Amino acid sequence: MSSAVVASSTTFLVALASSASRGGPRRGRVVGVAAPPALLYDGRAGRLALRAPPPPRPRPRRRDAGVVRRADDGENEAAVERAGEDDDEEEEFSSGAWQPPRSRRGGVGKVLKRRGTVPPVGRYGSGGDAARVRGAAAPAPAPTQDAASSKNGALLSGRDDDTPASRNGSVVTGADKPAAATPPVTITKLPAPDSPVILPSVDKPQPEFVIPDATAPAPPPPGSNPRSSAPLPKPDNSEFAEDKSAKVVESAPKPKATRSSPIPAVEEETWDFKKYFDLNEPDAAEDGDDDDDWADSDASDSEIDQDDDSGPLAGENVMNVIVVAAECSPWCKTGGLGDVAGALPKALARRGHRVMVVVPRYGDYAEAQDVGIRKYYKAAGQDLEVKYFHAFIDGVDFVFIDAPLFRHRQDDIYGGNRQEIMKRMILFCKAAVEVPWHVPCGGVPYGDGNLVFLANDWHTALLPVYLKAYYRDNGMMQYTRSVLVIHNIAYQGRGPVDEFPYMELPEHYLDHFKLYDPVGGEHANIFGAGLKMADRVVTVSPGYLWELKTTEGGWGLHDIIRENDWKMNGIVNGIDYREWNPEVDVHLQSDGYANYTVASLDSSKPRCKAALQRELGLEVRDDVPLIGFIGRLDGQKGVDIIGDAMPWIAGQDVQLVLLGSGRRDLEVMLQRFEAQHNSKVRGWVGFSVKMAHRITAGADVLVMPSRFEPCGLNQLYAMAYGTVPVVHAVGGLRDTMSAFDPFEDTGLGWTFDRAEPHKLIEALGHCLETYRKYKESWRGLQVRGMSQDLSWDHAAELYEEVLVKAKYQW
């Protein structure tokens, strides 16, 4: 075939026609001479065939005409410049009315009819390097304002929008010199396209499609171009849906541009093809929209999104938190630990965390349901079966661990000998550390990622040890952390070293348990090992943390606390206002009691006092001060100090009510006081939640002579109920109480600096004198106490900071 093509190519003769006269043939005309038939490749038929080139047609001799040509994809650009091209490959225009030329075929080369007297540049170019100007012997006139306003200097076609042809190299030809009667036509060389464009299918006429150009200059001021102020009709989007093959080839992003066309482009801000719309879908822009409308719409949508999706209070710090404690209010409680385990998890849940509380199942709790999980754990050399019960209350998962060792101990949680207590706590900690894997709370277990255990006191101090020894040392639960909370360091889980094997730990862990006590000698200390293994440690008040570092307040663990001071934090407890709130307290809604607020303090609190006097069999007197004590009966709470001050108290015109359980000798003391001073003293042995609420509401004074108090909750409850505290200034009592100043009329109650009977008598005497003689000052104490924000929400925020520190600790 190559020889036939070469032979046929030699038959072409090229002659240049020249004329000296202006009206003669144009300079630079390329005239093709017909050649004999040759074996040529027929692209339309897809085969070789004998063909003769068509005879050349004379070009019209019009001096005022410009010619616009275009080529199909893949056509040689040199063939476009060849003379003798078909008329349907040209567009001729003059100053008169323009008519579209004839066309044999559709597709890319087809001329699309447009409005106006000046025909447009071809919509789809050949993809060549640049537009070519033929017959440009005379220099082109300076660009007009219309030409400057068109993007990339494209030939104006009755509109100022950006067309594909203006960026893809349409072939432009023009006459040598325009006629005098014809307005000058601006011919500007087009730059090479920045990115290729895949053309739509040629089976049907293509719709008009405008691709925004991000490199275009800013548009002229409004009114400078009359034609740009008249928007054209928007293309019919239905044509886009019909052509499934049309798409745009992605190119590099371009900077932001301002459109000069009144028709909005698809993407306004940046040339981001990831956001580019699909041609098969309707156009999102509507007629008449502009940039300002779109910006306003985006801004309003953003504001709505921010309002509707504010997110949790914890923000990106949302975590899975498991609180592990030996007691939890309202199911089982002997002191402040039960209140913390019942209230803190709810406050954390309100901040957006997923929270679980794990406690032993001491009795039959109606809210808890058996989840059907059975596990076996070894405690003190014995395999014991464990069942899991679950309840979901106030946004918190409560998981109860059921085992024979825990049953029927509702009223004696910490009872039994040392070996029995240790056996229960070993089983409890082993079962609790695997709860996030086994218990499907809400159908989805917590898992071991983004998880923090919050252990409380020595009863659960083995949990950080088991977490590290069983799992983290073996490559499991690597993203699980543990925080140990110190509520009372006086109870440490001490035992002989030879009982260490009962804990089922590796032998080298014995070094973490060994502790030498000058009094007791060498022993195994569970609390000490937990403090070492925990990622973070929290005390229930900053003052208590300071005391723990001293020899007197550290109870033998002060050296460990000093060594781990970097991970210590002091956070004061809060109040669960849904349970401890005089305005909604359910225990004040019967038997003559009444709910009250600051506004109704003067009328409703005396009603609670009278109801309490009647219920306990005391004389109903509004003028007599009613003193209350609520707490555990042991040496820490200082109830024996009250016993030493009893002769002075019995000589005053007062009434005294004591509620608590604990040491048997102290229980007998309460019963003896009631028998000796039956008209003034009542001793309630045991613990009653209802009676605790009613004493707090009905008493005028709450006395707390604790020898040490890590935080203390009863003084917080008392202030919230308008009851004035008299406390020993130690630990958390010092942090939460400020002494009354009669000259400045400030403070919340009375404090004394030593746990001695005469100091208690001195502070209590000042309190009673103020109650009897200075009613306005007394009411100021009540109002200031009730006006404080003592909720758990602030404490939960501080706990969250500690949890985040533990999370990112390695």
UniProtKB/Swiss-Prot annotation:
Annotated EC: 2.4.1.21
Record carries keyword Transmembrane helix: no
Impact upon substituting residue 88 to E: Increased activity
Effect ascribed to mutating residue 781 to F: In strain: cv. Kinmaze
Region annotation (Disordered) ranges: 43-265, 281-313
Short name of one Pfam family: Glyco_trans_1_4
Comp. bias regions, Low complexity: 129-148
Transit peptide: 1-16
Superkingdom: Eukaryota
Acidic residues bias (residue ranges): 84-93, 281-310
UniProt note on tissues of expression: Expressed most exclusively in endosperm.
Pathway: Glycan biosynthesis; starch biosynthesis
Keywords: Amyloplast, Chloroplast, Glycosyltransferase, Plastid, Starch biosynthesis, Transferase, Transit peptide
Binding residue positions for ADP-alpha-D-glucose: 333
UniProt feature coiled coil, ranges: none
UniProt biased composition (Basic and acidic residues): 63-83
Miscellaneous section: Increased activity due to variations in subspecies indica is associated with the synthesis of the L-type amylopectin, which contains much lower proportion of short amylopectin chains than the S-type amylopectin found in most japonica varieties. The difference in amylopectin chain composition explains why starch from japonica subspecies has a lower gelatinisation temperature than starch from indica subspecies.
Family, as annotated: Belongs to the glycosyltransferase 1 family. Bacterial/plant glycogen synthase subfamily.
Name of the protein: Soluble starch synthase 2-3, chloroplastic/amyloplastic
Native organism: Oryza sativa subsp. japonica
Lineage: Eukaryota, Viridiplantae, Streptophyta, Embryophyta, Tracheophyta
Record gene name: SSII-3
